[in-house]
Amino acid sequence: MRGTPGDADGGGRAVYQSMCKPITGTINDLNQQVWTLQGQNLVAVPRSDSVTPVTVAVITCKYPEALEQGRGDPIYLGIQNPEMCLYCEKVGEQPTLQLKEQKIMDLYGQPEPVKPFLFYRAKTGRTSTLESVAFPDWFIASSKRDQPIILTSELGKSYNTAFELNIND
């Protein structure tokens, strides 16, 4: 997102620009656990020289005005190699976090927001929370080592919901 909050032409709102490619990097939680891929699951493992974190791809939704305001920047979140995107769906009564073979730029190019694949990224200092757009008040979370990345509605309890996104320059 590129914004000029005080710009008169933008009406005091952020001005969004089209992007030609996502930004990439890695994600870790405050316990220095990084995201890795084990089979079809994202798992949090302690950072070490022998661990290769997944490369995440992030791109801002082109149509933030179509979504709830004040919750954070709406982003699509994917991984590279294999190219997959995170999305949320209800399994039984519980919203769950899934990976789906999906090109992030195909989502970005859709004529309207694809809510199951969108997350509100709310930044606080160097960390961010990632809240499901499809399931408000459900956040991406990690827990103990070698456990899958999940969705939780229990902020600040037994799960880590604050993540650092380390962007490649």
UniProtKB/Swiss-Prot annotation:
Keywords: Cytokine, Cytoplasm, Immunity, Inflammatory response, Innate immunity, Secreted. Highly expressed in tissues containing epithelial cells: skin, lung, stomach and esophagus. Expressed in bronchial epithelial. In skin is expressed only in keratinocytes but not in fibroblasts, endothelial cells or melanocytes. Up-regulated in lesional psoriasis skin. Expressed in monocyte-derived dendritic cells and M1 macrophages. It is found in: Cytoplasm; Secreted. Transmembrane segments: none annotated. N-terminal truncation leads to a dramatic enhancement of its activity (>1000-fold). Proteolytically cleaved by cathepsin CTSG. SMART domains: IL1. Residues 1-17 form a propeptide. Pfam families: IL1. Its main location: cytoplasm. The keyword Secreted applies. One of its GO terms (molecular function) is cytokine activity. GO terms for cellular component: cytosol; extracellular region; extracellular space; nucleoplasm; plasma membrane. The keyword Heme does not apply. Induction: By TNF and by IFNG/IFN-gamma in keratinocytes. By Aspergillus fumigatus conidia in peripheral blood mnonocytes; involves CLEC7A and SYK. InterPro entries: IL-1_fam (IPR000975), IL-1RA/IL-36 (IPR003297), IL1/FGF (IPR008996). One of its GO terms (biological process) is immune response. Cytokine that binds to and signals through the IL1RL2/IL-36R receptor which in turn activates NF-kappa-B and MAPK signaling pathways in target cells. Part of the IL-36 signaling system that is thought to be present in epithelial barriers and to take part in local inflammatory response; similar to the IL-1 system with which it shares the coreceptor IL1RAP. Seems to be involved in skin inflammatory response by acting on keratinocytes, dendritic cells and indirectly on T-cells to drive tissue infiltration, cell maturation and cell proliferation. Belongs to the IL-1 family. Interacts with cargo receptor TMED10; the interaction mediates the translocation from the cytoplasm into the ERGIC (endoplasmic reticulum-Golgi intermediate compartment) and thereby secretion. This is Interleukin-36 gamma. It comes from Homo sapiens (Human).
